[in-house]
From Swiss-Prot:
Sperm. Pfam families: Egg_lysin. Dissolves the egg vitelline layer nonenzymatically during fertilization. It creates a hole of about 3 mu-m in diameter through which the sperm pass. The lineage of its organism: Eukaryota, Metazoa, Spiralia, Lophotrochozoa, Mollusca. CDD domains: Lysin-Sp18. Homodimer. This is Egg-lysin. InterPro entries: Egg_lysin, Egg_lysin_sf. Residues 1-18 form the signal peptide.
Length: 154
C-alpha cells in the first residue's frame, strides 16, 4: 500500500514538472506558420515511411500501408503541443521576428530528426498496425496543411 501511494505521488510530481510550475499561456500561431510546420513535419515522416516500406514493407497489405500513413498524421497531432514548446524556444532564440522560412526549417528538422523507423518496426513486429477505419481515411485524404491540431493558429 505504501509503495502504491509512493508511486502515485511520484507520478503526480512527474506530471506537475512536465507541465511546469506555473501556467504557460499558449502562443497562437499565424496560419501561414502553422501550415509551414505541418507540411514539413508530415513530409519528413512520409519520406521516412516510404524508405521504410521499400525495405521492410513487402509483407504488408495495401490497407496496412495506408494505416501507417495515418499513424504519421496522428503522431504529429498527438505531439503538436510538445513540438510547439521546442519551436517557441528556437524562435525566441532567433533574436528577431520569425518568418515563414524559419518555421519551414524547424518543421523539416522535426520531420527529419524523429526516428519513426523504430516506431514502424515496433508496430509491425508486434502486429499492432491499427485496423483501417473510416475516420482514418478522412484524415489521410486531407492535405497536410488542413490536418487539425489542438494548438490552433489564428
Amino acid at each position: 500500500m505504501k509503495l502504491l501511494v509512493l508511486c502515485i505521488f511520484a507520478m503526480m510530481a512527474t506530471l506537475a514538472m512536465s507541465r511546469r510550475w506555473h501556467y504557460v499561456p499558449p502562443k497562437f500561431l499565424n496560419k501561414a506558420f502553422e501550415v509551414a510546420l505541418k507540411v514539413q513535419i508530415i513530409a519528413g515522416f512520409d519520406r521516412t515511411l516510404v524508405k521504410w516500406l521499400r525495405t521492410h514493407g513487402g509483407t504488408l497489405s495495401h490497407v496496412q500501408k495506408k494505416a501507417l500513413y495515418f499513424v504519421n498524421r496522428r503522431y504529429m497531432q498527438t505531439h503538436w503541443a510538445n513540438y510547439m514548446l521546442w519551436i517557441n524556444k528556437k524562435t525566441d532564440a532567433l533574436g528577431r521576428t520569425p518568418v515563414v522560412g524559419d518555421y519551414t526549417r524547424l518543421g523539416a528538422e522535426i520531420g527529419r530528426r524523429i526516428d519513426m523507423d523504430y516506431f514502424y518496426n515496433f508496430l509491425k513486429g508486434r502486429n499492432m498496425i491499427p485496423k483501417y477505419l473510416p475516420y482514418m481515411e478522412e484524415i489521410n485524404r486531407m492535405r497536410s496543411a488542413d490536418i487539425p491540431v489542438k494548438y490552433m493558429g489564428k
